[in-house]
């Protein structure tokens, strides 16, 4: 297992990495602005489960295949980016749903947020490449590397989930403030959708 010094180095490095805005954070903020705090938090949960699925792949050695294969990397990247763009388009098309739901005192549903978050988290190839390059550096070569990789990935995912949840709550609070004038939610939902479209486009273009 990693030594105490390796754990400290890992926790510090993970904290610094997590503070840099990435696809998961931008997706979470976009969801919070579009569908609200509760849905965004459930999306964070789903995203974390998707990331954990990637950790399992990396621990099993399959992550290295995706990282090394240009075709596999491109397929996963395009699938994930296309899905995020589709979510953004749907948010813009249905931008009045939040206002209408508020007027009707009932929530709108367009897919379970946990499932949506899982899909986004599991189809981000950048995370796989990151885990392949990052996690083994803190594993003890003399121990069970696969088990250590899974443990490190679990800790990283938990830290990222806490950070994303804080951002979701903050963005959800901003949305609640906008909701004092329900008509503003149309613009806010469209803004969140635009953020997700921009995120998806970035995922497509960045190598």
Where are these regions (language model features)?
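Residue-level hotspots within pore-lining transmembrane alpha-helices
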Residues: 16, 20, 53, 119-126, ...
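Select subsegments of transmembrane alpha-helices in polytopic membrane proteins
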Residues: 48-53, 114-127, 189-192
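Hydrophobic alpha-helical transmembrane segments in multi-pass integral membrane proteins
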Residues: 55-59, 123-128, 195-207
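Selective transmembrane alpha-helices of multi-pass membrane proteins
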Residues: 67-99, 157, 163-167, 175-207
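Cytosolic-biased juxtamembrane loops and peripheral soluble domains of multi-pass membrane proteins
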Residues: 91-120, 179
């Amino acid at each position: 297992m990693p030594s105490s010094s390796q754990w400290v180095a890992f926790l510090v490095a993970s904290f610094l990495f997590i503070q840099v805005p990435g696809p998961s954070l931008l997706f979470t903020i976009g969801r919070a602005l579009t569908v609200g705090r509760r849905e965004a938090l459930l999306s964070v949960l789903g995203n974390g489960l998707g990331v954990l699925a990637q950790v399992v792949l990396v621990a099993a050695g399959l992550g290295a295949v995706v990282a090394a294969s240009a075709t596999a990397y491109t397929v996963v990247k395009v699938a994930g980016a296309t899905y995020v763009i589709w979510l953004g388009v749907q948010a813009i098309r249905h931008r009045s749903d939040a206002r209408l739901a508020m007027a009707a005192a009932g929530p709108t549903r367009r897919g379970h947020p946990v499932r949506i978050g899982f899909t986004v988290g599991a189809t981000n190839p950048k995370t796989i490449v990151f885990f392949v390059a990052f996690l083994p550096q803190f594993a003890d070569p003399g121990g069970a590397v696969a088990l250590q990789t899974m443990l490190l990935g679990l800790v990283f995912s938990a830290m990222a989930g806490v950070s994303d949840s804080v951002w979701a709550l903050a963005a959800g609070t901003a949305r609640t403030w906008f909701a004092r004038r329900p008509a503003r939610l149309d613009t806010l939902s469209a803004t969140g959708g635009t953020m997700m479209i921009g995120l998806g486009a970035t995922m497509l273009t960045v190598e």
